[in-house]
Amino acid sequence: ADVVLNSGIPITVIGWDPSLYDAMIDTEKIQEIESIGTKYSKFTNDIQVVLREMMKDIFGSDSYDLPDPLAMSVYLDNEIISQSAEVNVRVDTRDGMTRGGCVLDYLNLEPDAPKVRVVQRCHGDKFYNLLKQSLA
């Protein structure tokens, strides 16, 4: 990660929060995806069986999030991003538990550190529409 972040190429990162807030597939959407009726839509719901059970057990809802498809959607269409920030980033390269962890510097304490674009929120409706198109 340190080599990539110091490469100078533009980098966009997206964490779990946008997926949990903006790419959550609830019961209604699960049914909509199923009704698309393609092998892709069936696969999309079927592969989430374990996550759906976990979400039922923990949160009491039949739902799942789609972090990887959301990341791909952001790559394909930057208009899906509703909020982002350019921040400095460092990778911990020391030995120990935090080795490889990224530290995001929102306070600009290390202005010479490499910068990344951090996606904070997405337009969930745009993501969902793109998802449905890709499953049709």
PLM region descriptions:
Residues 1-6:
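Active-site glycine-rich loop that binds ribose-phosphate moieties when present
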Residues 11-136:
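Conformational coupling and interaction surfaces
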